[in-house]
Amino acid sequence: MIRLTPASAHGLHGHVTVPGDKSISHRALMFGAIAKGQTVITNFLASDDVLHTMTVFRNLGVAIQQNENSVRIQGQGFDGLTPPKKPLDMGNSGTSTRLLMGLLSKQNFDMSIIGDESLSQRPMTRVMKPLTEMGAKIDLTANGTLPGIIQANATLRGITYDMPVASAQVKSAILLAGIQAEGETCVIEKIASRDHTERMLRQFGGQLESKNGVITLKKQQQLQGQHVDVPADISSAAFFLVAALITPNSELTINRVGINPTRDGILKILTRMGASIEVTPIDTQGEPLADLTVRTQTLHGIDITAADIPSAVDELPIIALAATQADGDTIISGAEELRVKETDRIATVISELSKLGANIEEKPDGMIIHGGQSLTADNDAVLLDSCGDHRIAMMNAIAALITTGDVILTGEDAMSVSYPGFLEDLSEVML
């Protein structure tokens, strides 16, 4: 529990370097573990979720050395994993669970997979369904949740799968199984989801074709270890972008942020709301990077629809906070996915911001945010609950910057899932 005070009249100023991208850090570990030879990961995100992925591979016999934000992996190829001596603990990481269900679905030994209380309530059936069609043998609870077992399996077969809902995790699970499957695997997306898996597969020497929403690949003979320099996470940068926009007299630059076009929904949405964000591209061979500079500006309400969600799903809580300060209403629709995150993020965003006086209506697939609301703590301080959700915790901390009165935040340790040093970095730009 910590007490947070409003920003000073001076506002927020300076440069921020947020940690490495969580999605890319996960995938770099996975590809490094199944590739042949050494993989080096720099600007690695050593957060709780990603460290669970690392521990899983160590328990599968992969030699991994970590020195702060640098990692070396000695990969032994697809068949180089060894039976674990205990259940594979995914912690709170849905990314680890869903992607590894695909990647580990063709091993010659059984694996038990477990997670914490929150993860054990999140649905896994939508991943299991296409993997089962490919020949994977996965057992879950009657509710389609963890704990589960990935059974020993000698053969996978390629399938054509039409994604019913945009999901990078489901798509990636299919592709990670597909690189080990006989025949052709084809994933059809109506709305593009983040493409880090496809980009990284190519970097490690894999081959696939992606055209007009159709991703096609065949069994890969062997991947080769690589150097992966992880960009700063745009999902973490989003909190500082919004903080500068809504905190008076502020100007911040966030350094070396990954601006992958399947992840830059936050930039497009804030721009539509009236933000002017300076994007200074950085030459790079891997994922596109840029420095982002933003100043305090007046925002206006917009409609955020299903087509916007895949490239900004993790940023919707902080977008909701920005919308409370905008002129007019912001309507978020097609965001049912928020119901099955670490918390029901639709309900949790509304419950926490409403404690500060925000006027938000709940919809089955989103929310209606009535803008122009001053945030106020009754009786000089209000208690906000992180609810075990890292993105809710950081949203609450940014809300405290513009709240009249103090915020007492509980569960702030949840931030370590994606951004262990968030409060320290926020304090630096408040000086």
From Swiss-Prot:
A Pfam family it matches: EPSP_synthase
Top-rank EC class of the record's enzyme: transferase
Annotated metabolic or biological route of this protein: Metabolic intermediate biosynthesis; chorismate biosynthesis; chorismate from D-erythrose 4-phosphate and phosphoenolpyruvate: step 6/7
Enzyme Commission number, as recorded: 2.5.1.19
GO MF term (any one): 3-phosphoshikimate 1-carboxyvinyltransferase activity
Function field: Catalyzes the transfer of the enolpyruvyl moiety of phosphoenolpyruvate (PEP) to the 5-hydroxyl of shikimate-3-phosphate (S3P) to produce enolpyruvyl shikimate-3-phosphate and inorganic phosphate.
Binding site for phosphoenolpyruvate: 22, 94, 122, 169, 345, 391
GO biological process, one term: chorismate biosynthetic process
Cellular component annotations (GO), alphabetically ordered: cytoplasm
Compartment(s): Cytoplasm
Quaternary structure (record): Monomer.
Alphabetized NCBIfam families for the sequence: aroA
Coiled-coil stretches noted in the UniProt entry, renumbered to this chain: none
Organism whose genome encodes this protein: Leuconostoc citreum (strain KM20)
Active site, UniProt feature: 314 (proton acceptor)
Binding site for 3-phosphoshikimate: 22-23, 27, 167, 169, 314, 341
Name of this chain's protein: 3-phosphoshikimate 1-carboxyvinyltransferase
Recorded catalytic activity of this chain's protein: 3-phosphoshikimate + phosphoenolpyruvate = 5-O-(1-carboxyvinyl)-3-phosphoshikimate + phosphate
Domain of life: Bacteria
